[in-house]
């Protein structure tokens, strides 16, 4: 991650690119962008952003979604793919959290001013949802 290490990596990539592609194509390349893998903290922040988007949709019904750190770790264990980066996180949250909250709304298990807390049921090794009627809309 040091500037010298990054520059050395960039040069190695350019060498491979030059050996693989024709000069006509190389003339069209302006630069090579190098990415580093996302860290654990950054992935947690991405989950927070996804949950914030879901909360934006739930706000009109005066419902708040809270995801515990343990549940976030569970999401990362089940959804993160080093090859795909953070992309699978959104789909996983939609499939396993947002869909369950939607079912709860349709079953009228979430009255207005409710908080849905997502945690991990350790004995079953899956997500659990608890409802508390305490959220006050602003």
Swiss-Prot record:
Gene Ontology process terms (BP): cellular response to heat
Entries under PANTHER family matching the protein: ATP-DEPENDENT CLP PROTEASE, HEAT SHOCK PROTEIN 104
InterPro entries attached to this UniProt entry: Clp_ATPase_C (IPR019489), ClpA_ClpB (IPR050130), P-loop_NTPase (IPR027417)
GO MF annotation terms: ATP binding; ATP hydrolysis activity
Annotated keywords: ATP-binding, Chaperone, Nucleotide-binding, Repeat
Pfam families: ClpB_D2-small
SMART domains reported in the protein's UniProt record: ClpB_D2-small
One GO cellular component term: cytoplasm
Protein name: Heat shock protein 100
Transmembrane segment boundaries: none
Organism (species): Trypanosoma cruzi
Family that this chain belongs to: Belongs to the ClpA/ClpB family.
């Amino acid at each position: 991650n040091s500037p010298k290490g990054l520059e050395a990596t960039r040069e190695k990539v350019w060498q491979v690119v030059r050996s693989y592609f024709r000069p006509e194509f190389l003339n069209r390349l302006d630069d090579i962008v190098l990415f580093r893998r996302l860290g654990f903290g950054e992935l947690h922040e991405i989950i927070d952003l996804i949950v914030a988007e879901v909360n934006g949709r739930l706000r009109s019904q005066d419902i708040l979604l809270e995801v515990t750190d343990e549940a976030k770790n569970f999401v990362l264990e089940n959804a993160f793919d080093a090859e795909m980066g953070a992309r699978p996180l959104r789909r996983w949250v939609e499939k396993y959290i947002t869909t369950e909250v939607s079912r709860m709304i349709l079953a009228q298990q979430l009255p207005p001013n409710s908080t849905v807390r997502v945690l991990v049921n350790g004995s079953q090794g899956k997500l659990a949802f608890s409802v508390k009627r305490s959220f006050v809309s602003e």
